[in-house]
Amino acid sequence: MSKYQKICTNVKISEIHFKNGTIDIYFKDSDEYNLLIACADCCSESWFELFVDDPIDQIIGKKIQSVQYVKDIDLPPSGVQECDINHVYRINFTDDTHYDFILRNSSNGYYDGWLEIHKKKILKKLII
C-alpha cells in the first residue's frame, strides 16, 4: 500500500499547475485537488524538476492509481548549496502508464528533502 494515501485516485485529471516547489493536480467534476510539495529540512532547499522530453501536461485526462518513490539519481550539481540529492518519484495511472519527476534537494550534506501530498478543497468564488 502506498504511503501517499491523500492522493485522489480513479478520477480524471483535468488541469495541472507546475511551479518549482509545488505541483497542483485538479480533477474533473471534483471539488478537490492534490497539492504535491517539495519539502526540505531546516538548512536545505527542495524543488521539483521535470525530465526534458517529458512535459507534465501529458497526464491530463489520466486517472491516478498511486504515487511512489523510485530511486535516487545523479544529476549535474545545482549550485544551490554544497551537496545535492535527487529523488525520482513516479505517478502510476490506471491505464498502466506512469509519469516520473524529480525531487531535488540541496544542503550542506546533512539534510534531505521529501515529498508531501495534501488533499485540498477548491474554494468557490462568491458572486455578489
Tell what function each PLM region has:
Residues 1-128:
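Surface-exposed, interaction-prone regions used to assemble/regulate multi-protein complexes
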